[in-house]
Amino acid sequence: MNIYLIGILCIVGLIISQGSTANGSPLDDRFNDVNTINKKQFTEEEFSRLINSMLKKYIEDKNVDIRIIGNKKDKQPTQKTTPKPTTPKQINDGTSDKTSDTHTIKRTTPKPTTPKQINDGTSDKTSDTHTIKRTTPKPTTPKQINDGTSDKTSDTHTIKRTTPKPTTPKQINDGTSDKTSDTHTIKRTTPKPTTPKQINDGTSDKPKSIADIFLINKPKVPLWIVNPLYYMVEKFVQIMGYLLEDDDTLELNLPKYYYDKSI
């Protein structure tokens, strides 16, 4: 857009705004209300009433928030996980009907050994049918452990001593070893140092925001250099305010930091 068109639009806008508020009654009423509020002297009771009402409203809002959170928790019940009871191993002593393939222990009772009858000629019974053979239990020989020193080999009772293989620790390739391992190589990852965030406490030269550039407290950066268009519009508004000054209108008092003290 052309700069002249922008200037014309600004002039028209100012004339319309000044014409609509020429009577000044709405502005006067508003300023009067503000002045009466500022001049009013509040008593201690009014202050206490105001503080109590604010605290009451704060507590009510807080209770509402707590109720909302409680309702959300009630709608989503937590599922309780109960641990399964551990059943003891069943011993099959002959009275139970249930059979367990893995945990059943059979109780074997030894048969009573009856003494062998000796036929001394006085008995009528023949020894062919009623002779009881004395069965002597075989001595239980310990199982032979084939440790390499014995020459005898046992097919059934030989227990092979299996020594566990020593677990070799995984090699960490730190650059000093020549051997490379495809599967057991562990890469040593060093965490990156965390740099603390810089806090702008006012001593730094970097501006905190764009508003710092436009503040007039810094005489090194004049406003008309930073933004010439803004400077021209500001001066134009001041001139139009003085030209249109009447008894019904108020002088345009801009904030202090809008004025350029360096000029």
Curated annotation (Swiss-Prot):
Residues 70-207 are annotated as: Disordered. Residues 78-90 have a biased composition (Low complexity). Sequence repeats lie at residues 81-107, 108-134, 135-161, 162-188, 189-206. This antigen is recognized by sera from infected human. Isoforms are highly similar and contain variable numbers of identical direct tandem repeats of 81 bases. It comes from the Eukaryota. The keyword Transit peptide does not apply. Residues 95-104, 122-131, 149-158, 176-185 have a biased composition (Basic and acidic residues). This is Antigen 10-3. Residues 81-189 are annotated as: 5 X 27 AA tandem repeats. Keywords: Repeat, Signal. Residues 1-21 form the signal peptide. Disulfide bonds: none annotated.
